[in-house]
Amino acid sequence: MSLRGVSARLLSRRSGLRFPRFPRTWSSAAAHTEKTQIRPAKSSRPVFDWKDPLILEEQLTADEKLIRDTFRNYCQERLMSRILLANRNEVFHRDIVYEMGELGVLGPTIKGYGCAGVSSVAYGLLTRELERVDSGYRSMMSVQSSLVMHPIYTYGSEEQRQKYLPGLAKGELLGCFGLTEPNHGSDPGGMETRARHNPSNQSYTLSGTKTWITNSPVADLFIVWARCEDNCIRGFILEKGMRGLSAPRIEGKFSLRASATGMIIMDSVEVPEENVLPNVSSLAGPFGCLNTARYGITWGVLGAAEFCLHTARQYALDRIQFGVPLARNQLVQKKLADMLTEITLGLHACLQLGRLKDQDKATPEMVSMLKRNNCGKALDIARQARDILGGNGISDEYHVIRHAMNLEAVNTYEGTHDIHALILGRAITGIQAFTVGK
């Protein structure tokens, strides 16, 4: 499906969802800054627009803008109204997956199988808008699109693609990705999950435990990576209800509370041979999935950072201390300038990386560089915004503290800040530093 085709689909689907209009509150005003600010008057001289400092808008295609704007409306009108209580009560709304499937934004870069087939930049713009609301919602979308649909599309058989991708694209099926284990986070090569082949009945028996798995408590499908008897790493498609398979929820999170996180416990789960992903047999499989997901994260975290910047700016303009707005304070202006600079540079780097991906010129090191940079900078921006809000900054009604808490997790998962530094260090020096003496 062409970009223009998916744009039309997004718009036509939107009317069917009948988005309600919610009264504007101060806490959501910053998210709508772009709608409420007066555009500079046209003149013969260029005028600096702080909302788009290096004119990113002109580098996007008409279809990319339309896709983004349509999804932005959905996120602000349907999701922003739910997130406060969802985060406060640690509730994941399954209906959101159906709604996103209706909009066509799940697995959006995949061509065929009910997917939209949009550009990598369009996908990045979608994650940016979603994480502007909440990192937990974006995490769900990233897992579904990059860690479940991508491996089935890239490493799966045609039968597997036909069987699973249409349902995943519609949101009828929700998936999760099992790689991290209790004793193996940054070192997936040490995984203890085992798959034993049973030639007599053409199946595999999986045993092991995965943890910190987004979507697992509510998942219908489980993409699980296990070490086989030949020492190869293979991917398996497990289905909810298989004997010996359970996915208990992890309770008490202070981050990503609007998404469901849990474990995958496999007690001699029998999986038919037809559920093995046939086109990969090494860690290149899960790493390829993670690189795809990390790309979406590089855009997404900047959406959260933008929300924090806009909220802090509006608060500094409205808040009067010592008879003047906080925004008159030089230290506050410096913080806002630093935030704007980092967001702008990050967005343009994301755009370049997206164009390179669509030309098959992107490398894992490029993704690591931006995942590391943008996550770290977004977390710093959220912390600075919370500081500008003073005591109000710790109230969830202003949303900034929620973004800060979420970004603590995002800066850690799918490769920590330091692990990505080692990936880059290896590329720079030619020497791996993940292990000592090897």
UniProtKB/Swiss-Prot annotation:
The modification N6-succinyllysine is found at K51. FAD binds at residues 177-186, 212-214, 319, 330, 387-391, 416-418, 434. The active site is at E414. Disruption phenotype: Animals show highly increased protein glutarylation in liver. Keywords: Acetylation, FAD, Flavoprotein, Mitochondrion, Oxidoreductase, Transit peptide. One of its GO terms (molecular function) is glutaryl-CoA dehydrogenase activity. Residues 1-44 form a transit peptide. Catalyzes the oxidative decarboxylation of glutaryl-CoA to crotonyl-CoA and CO(2) in the degradative pathway of L-lysine, L-hydroxylysine, and L-tryptophan metabolism. It uses electron transfer flavoprotein as its electron acceptor. Homotetramer. PANTHER family: GLUTARYL-COA DEHYDROGENASE, MITOCHONDRIAL. This is Glutaryl-CoA dehydrogenase, mitochondrial.
